């Protein structure tokens, strides 16, 4: 006769204790950054330069503190003015678009800067370009002479464009009007 098989030695069941872990609290979705509302910018100084002729410009940053830059363009007066912290630091005679290719009115942020830009449409140099619109309207250097016009851009004397290019940043505002000029004490939205 055979002897009964030896019982197998199976380990006894072991109780497993769960290790407590901290479950992070649900993360709320990120909130969008607050959108800044442009602050009104008071005009504190206008350059005392008299009438500007085609090709002329003025630039004076002496004793002007740092501050936000706002560029205004008056198509009726054919002038561009540069304000830093409310002080006019530059002004120039401009060229602008024709009836067929008009310069748009409104407030535009500078979206791109390119010191050596060449138009992909007209194969023309556009030195010191400050791009304003997706379809290519820009402020740029050119020969500013009576009888000339642009295809919608704002042309300024090239030497002035270089100074403006050094002062302006992407995001700075360019306000284009037809017949609205600013005087000391007035405000504009930057």
Regions of interest found by a model, annotated:
Residues 5-98:
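Cell wall/extracellular polymer interaction/catalysis modules
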Residues 1-18, 47, 54, 59-66, ...:
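Exported/periplasmic cell-wall-interacting domains
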């Amino acid at each position: 006769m055979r002897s009964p098989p030896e019982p197998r030695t199976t380990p006894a069941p072991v109780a497993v204790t769960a290790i407590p872990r901290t479950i992070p609290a649900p993360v709320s979705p990120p909130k969008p950054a607050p959108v800044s509302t442009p602050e009104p910018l008071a005009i504190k100084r206008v350059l005392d330069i008299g009438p500007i002729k085609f090709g002329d410009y003025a630039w004076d940053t002496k004793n002007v503190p740092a501050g936000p830059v706002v560029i205004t363009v008056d198509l009726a007066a054919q002038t561009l003015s540069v304000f830093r912290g409310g002080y006019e630091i530059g002004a120039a005679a401009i060229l602008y678009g024709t009836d067929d290719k008009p310069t748009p009115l409104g407030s535009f942020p500078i979206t791109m800067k390119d010191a050596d830009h060449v138009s992909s449409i007209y194969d023309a140099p556009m030195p010191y370009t400050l791009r304003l619109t997706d379809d290519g309207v820009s402020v740029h250097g050119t020969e500013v002479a009576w009888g000339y016009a642009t295809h919608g851009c704002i042309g300024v004397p090239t030497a002035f464009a270089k100074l403006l290019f050094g002062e302006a940043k992407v995001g700075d505002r360019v306000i284009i009007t037809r017949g609205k000029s600013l005087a000391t004490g007035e405000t504009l939205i930057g």
